[in-house]
């Protein structure tokens, strides 16, 4: 397309593509940011009651997606509610009213206090906010490579 008009191609296609890729990479990194050091496959979160789910096919129910990848997007919220005891046992972090870019920004600025304010304490998974904060810090700390 640049043979037609380079400026139009650059601003409409190239910048949009690069911006979209960066946002998607930030989102993907955030979806898997809270790594359980005991079970490395247990690293996803759920964002519930957020506008993002309405426009992105319930993508923010990411832990549900990992457990049931073939589930139709309209069935994901019900699946989450049906299996909430499993997510409590796994200590999967459910955030309410925020999406991945909020979480990414607060992780990069170490604002765990803001993250804790948006954690849903399902079935009293956490005794205190400090316990939720400690879990988040534990799951985002630097891991040592196996030697």
Describe these PLM feature segments.
Residues 2-12:
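Helix-coil boundary and interhelical linker segments in multi-pass alpha-helical membrane proteins
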Residues 13, 19-147:
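Cytosolic/stromal cytosol-facing helical appendages immediately following the last transmembrane segment
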């Amino acid at each position: 397309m640049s043979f037609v008009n380079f400026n139009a191609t650059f601003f409409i296609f190239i910048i949009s593509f690069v911006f979209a890729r960066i946002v998607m990479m930030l989102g993907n990194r955030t979806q898997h940011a809270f790594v359980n050091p005991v079970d490395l496959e247990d690293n996803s979160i759920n964002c519930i009651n957020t506008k993002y789910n309405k426009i992105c096919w319930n993508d923010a129910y990411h832990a549900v997606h990992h457990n049931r990848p073939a589930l139709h997007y309209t069935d994901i919220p019900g699946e989450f509610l049906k299996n909430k005891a499993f997510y409590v046992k796994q200590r999967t972090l459910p955030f309410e009213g925020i999406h991945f870019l909020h979480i990414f920004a607060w992780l990069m600025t170490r604002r765990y206090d803001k993250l804790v304010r948006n954690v849903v304490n399902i079935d009293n998974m956490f005794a205190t906010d400090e316990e939720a904060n400690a879990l988040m810090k534990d799951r985002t700390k630097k891991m040592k490579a196996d030697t």
